[in-house]
Amino acid sequence: MLSSCNEHTNKSTQQVNKDTIQKKSNPVVYFEIPVIDMERATRFYSTVFNFKFDTTIIDKNEMALFPFTEEKSGISGALAKGEIYKPTKDGVLIYFNTANMDETLRLANTNGGKILYPKTDNSIGLVAEFEDTEGNRIALYQSKE
């Protein structure tokens, strides 16, 4: 009887621990944006968002890593160039945070991007979408605060 009680308790504890761990972290931890021309793409994202990239090679693919700090919320990722990476407007949509939607859209448009969905005020903030220099659809978000 005691062993079956402990077995049940252990299973329950394992489930609670797993649930707690899953609730303490965001489900998405990393992203990669496909690029054709790494220099053009890093110049675009550096200009539009004022990002500084660290570059590296991972599994024979060129990567330009977006800035990341453990102290801030959110995830990070990379611009990725390689045979397996194909830019698209039809796939996953990544939202970048911005403090000034109008300026970010202006910079995207004047640096080779195209506005796909104009600034729109929805119930949680401002959103917009643009095509980057590589042909990817990228979204913007600005909070109402």
PLM region spans:
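Vicinal oxygen chelate
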Residues: N6-N26, Y30-I33, D54-I57, L105-E145
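C-terminal motif of bacterial Sec signal peptides marking the signal peptidase cleavage site
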Residues: L2-S4
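Active-site/binding-pocket entry motifs
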Residues: K72, Y85-K86
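Short beta-strand micro-motifs in enzyme catalytic cores
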Residues: E62-A64, V92, L126-A128
